[in-house]
């Protein structure tokens, strides 16, 4: 395991903690896409089905459990504890537009036609587009709270660090995972416009608006 993988995991964890902290402190989930959070929970669920059958390391197991817990606690806060503050009128992205093609692609492009492998592949493809409902929500409302933009920044940073991790693994181990790399590149592309706005606006104390034609 190299430093890029560890930093990527920490960035991902920080993003989730920031989001949970924001919801808990404000007792409000306005501006947060519940649909994106459902997709992320689905990503972790289908990816970590091997949690009790395939032990790699304590670090790996702990991170899987933490990500699953954070994902489902976030969904619970949005649709349960603080559901009265949920902005359902603006969280209108049609999930079937993502789920149907991702399911189809998972059956067509995978490494092995087994249940666990197809579900793992599904999780990789789905993660690459799971943020779209959140970006769509921002483009629809015209702006995002600062803490939400920090959450998105660290999610994007996690993806960028994982790309560096794959490059490093290819150099040192001659390891190349085409499905993960291509999906990671696609996901990073979705964040590129956001990164520019984050640096030019948010870091200068301005509110972020994200025009995004869908």
Curated annotation (Swiss-Prot):
Please give the Gene Ontology molecular function terms for this protein: ER retention sequence binding; KDEL sequence binding
Q: Region Important for recycling of cargo proteins with the sequence motif K-D-E-L from the Golgi to the endoplasmic reticulum: start and end of each range?
A: 204-207
Q: How does it sit in the membrane?
A: Multi-pass membrane protein
- State whether keyword DNA damage applies: no
Q: Where in the cell is it found?
A: Endoplasmic reticulum membrane; Golgi apparatus membrane; Cytoplasmic vesicle, COPI-coated vesicle membrane
Cytoplasmic compartment spans: 25-32, 80-92, 136-149, 200-214
Q: Region entry Interaction with the K-D-E-L motif on target proteins: which residue ranges?
A: 47-48, 159-169
Q: Which residues lie on this side of the membrane: Lumenal?
A: 1-4, 53-58, 111-116, 169-178
In which broad location class does this protein mainly occur, judging by the first location in its UniProt entry?
endoplasmic reticulum
- Supply the alphabetized keyword list: Cytoplasmic vesicle, Endoplasmic reticulum, ER-Golgi transport, Golgi apparatus, Membrane, Protein transport, Receptor, Transmembrane, Transmembrane helix, Transport
Give the site residues for Interaction with the K-D-E-L motif on target proteins: 5, 117
Tell what the record comments on domains: Binds the C-terminal sequence motif K-D-E-L in a hydrophilic cavity between the transmembrane domains. This triggers a conformation change that exposes a Lys-rich patch on the cytosolic surface of the protein. This patch mediates recycling from the Golgi to the endoplasmic reticulum, probably via COPI vesicles.
**Family affiliation:** Belongs to the ERD2 family.
| Protein's job | Receptor for the C-terminal sequence motif K-D-E-L that is present on endoplasmic reticulum resident proteins and that mediates their recycling from the Golgi back to the endoplasmic reticulum.
Listed name of the protein: ER lumen protein-retaining receptor 3
- Gene it is expressed from: KDELR3
């Amino acid at each position: 395991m190299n430093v890029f993988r560890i930093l990527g995991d920490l960035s991902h964890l920080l993003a989730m903690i920031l989001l949970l902290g924001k919801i808990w402190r404000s007792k409000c989930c306005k501006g947060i896409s519940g649909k994106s959070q459902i997709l992320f929970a689905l990503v972790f669920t289908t990816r970590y089905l091997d949690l009790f059958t395939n032990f790699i390391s304590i670090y790996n197991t702990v991170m899987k459990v933490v990500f699953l817990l954070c994902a489902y606690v976030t969904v619970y806060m949005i649709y349960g504890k603080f559901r009265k503050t949920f902005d359902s009128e603006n969280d209108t992205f049609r999930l079937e537009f993502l789920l149907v093609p991702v399911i189809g692609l998972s059956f067509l492009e995978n490494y092995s036609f087994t249940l666990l492998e197809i579900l793992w592949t599904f999780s990789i493809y789905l993660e690459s587009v799971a943020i779209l409902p959140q970006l769509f929500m921002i483009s629809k409302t015209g702006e995002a709270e600062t803490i939400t933009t920090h959450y998105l920044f660290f999610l994007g940073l996690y993806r960028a660090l994982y790309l560096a991790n794959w490059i490093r693994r290819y150099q040192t181990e001659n390891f190349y995972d085409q499905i993960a790399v291509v999906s990671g590149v696609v996901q990073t592309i979705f964040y590129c416009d956001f990164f520019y706005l984050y640096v030019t606006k948010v870091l200068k104390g301005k509110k972020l608006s994200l025009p995004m034609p869908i």
